[in-house]
């Protein structure tokens, strides 16, 4: 199976693709991630996923074009979007707002291929237990929240904060595997049939466009 392109710098998304044995090469797109006025969380992540996939596809030489997979994830409480915290106080404020309540995690996933651009949307509900200020501060100092939407990683230390998830665990991580597999199999890709050697699932030579 030839590798697809993964339009993401996220090691979590790469690891999730490896989990379902999809060989891929990482290509990091330069896309403005600002939210448009009046844009819902669902519209936001779908637009960004599509934009990332399209940007990579358009920069590939015609003889190197293979399907491009992209995704975008955001955490939402009501209509407020929580991106990646830039500093300690922002991360702590995010966690305090998420403490003891149920929020939504939206992940848009898109595939650009020779036949066009397809996308899917995963929406999950995550309920956190009550968090103390000291826990929020300590979690920031663990180094884990810095590059995570909503300021937490469900697969990391923050797993101890999560009381319940309704939806897609992999979607909360950043790449919903069910929706991803549906998009790829629709293109004729056979999941799980890649090389036995897992080291061959990630093609060396990450690049940016």
Show which residues each predicted segment covers.
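N-terminal beta1-alpha1 ligand-phosphate binding loop
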Residues: 2-22
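Cofactor-binding loop segments of dinucleotide-utilizing enzymes, especially the Rossmann-like FAD-
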Residues: 9, 29, 114
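Short loop/helix-cap segments at secondary-structure boundaries that form the rim of catalytic
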Residues: 15-19, 36, 62
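Residue-level marker of intrinsically disordered, low-complexity segments enriched
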Residues: 18, 24-29, 200-201, 207
């Amino acid at each position: 199976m030839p590798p697809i392109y993964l339009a993401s710098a996220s090691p979590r998304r790469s690891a999730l693709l490896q989990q379902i044995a999809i060989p891929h090469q990482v290509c990091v797109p330069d896309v403005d991630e600002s939210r448009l006025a009046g844009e819902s969380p669902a519209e936001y992540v779908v637009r960004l996923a599509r934009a990332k996939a399209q940007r990579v596809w358009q920069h590939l030489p015609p003889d190197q074009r293979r399907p491009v997979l992209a995704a975008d994830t955001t955490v939402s409480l009501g209509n407020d979007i929580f991106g990646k915290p830039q500093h300690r106080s922002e991360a702590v404020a995010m966690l305090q707002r998420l403490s003891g309540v149920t929020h939504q995690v939206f992940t848009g996933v898109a595939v650009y291929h020779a036949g066009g651009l397809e996308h899917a949307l995963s929406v999950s509900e995550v309920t956190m237990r009550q968090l103390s200020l000291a826990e929020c501060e300590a979690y920031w100092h663990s180094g884990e929240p810095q590059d995570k939407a909503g300021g937490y990683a469900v697969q990391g230390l923050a797993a101890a904060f999560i009381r319940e998830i309704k939806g897609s665990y992999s979607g909360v991580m950043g790449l919903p595997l069910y929706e991803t597999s549906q998009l790829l199999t629709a293109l004729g890709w056979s999941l799980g049939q890649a090389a036995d050697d897992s080291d061959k699932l990630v093609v060396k030579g990450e690049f940016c466009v």
